[in-house]
């Protein structure tokens, strides 16, 4: 497979040189599978195999791009795309800066995040996985829905400057299972990210779903008073908050365009809890890390927060060119963010519920419809959903109706952080739309944060 891709890129490079074009050629191939469930039945089972080419032509301060979905045997159509670039360049407006043209100094071949067993997963295995996680939990009132998405992604690059190529292949799976009560209108869910087949663990999801359904059926449903609570975040909430925080606050582009909540002078400042260490770590195959970025820069661990101190901004090549900065190897389709684990020995939902409690704790596994309210202040909002629990000091458990949180990133990850689980898990944040781009974070199983304010509390589910 890799030889076919590289041979194609080299043919296209020669075709571009013959047209006197200075071109970066990006190759993207996906083999994607999706099984969707609704009302305790398969509602969709589909797959697609797509190959895309992205051409970027450079001429001084001019840059134009053209993309197409291709048949790999139809070289003529691909070369017509190059002809379109020739026609576009004279009409392009010059940029205010000189964009860097990639000059690859070596071949890069990276399949560290590829697993042939996951790539070959069958429909029967996907169905058996869902049957296992939902076994004994469905009823006339409680219905199963969700998705099982998995696939293989290949990306590769070549430029007209050298014959060196970059080639990356990875496999991924993203599972979301939801059980909902048609009469009471509550929903609970469980999720899993996988880079290899052995990561798939349907019994673990069944255990979490069983526990949540048990409490949602038996425990009292309550409207919580607004106010401040000690909150335990699940991996979904932690990962989504971290993902948005990194994109809105920790990139050079966000800094220079004025919407980051961090300033240049904040580098080195203690803005977060000393328990928080956040790194973009491309060595982590579990979260689809890759060895080099799109411009050929070697990817190395890049500390963003060290013991609570903000370290540095991430610079992609184009932003670095525009603002006169040094790129940091972040011209990638996705980051590989890791929050280090802590010292708390709590590795499962069952263990969290069994912990002795000195105060009431609001468990929020997932923050729904998360949005940035004010990026320059780092303020986000979202509501609890899919399995929140109110763990009372007296040992009892109640089921809270949805609540809204509107807080700053520094509230979630600041001095209020009480503890982090030692156990870490991968959480998948891949989009279901557009081209396949496996994305995940590695975060503590639980993070406990004090003084999180509930600004609104629903009177029902």
Walk through the language-model features, giving the residues of each.
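Active-site bordering "gate/hinge" segments
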Residues: 1-290, 297, 306-309, 431-437, ...
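Dual-mode signal for accessory low-complexity, basic/Gly-rich regions
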Residues: 266-461
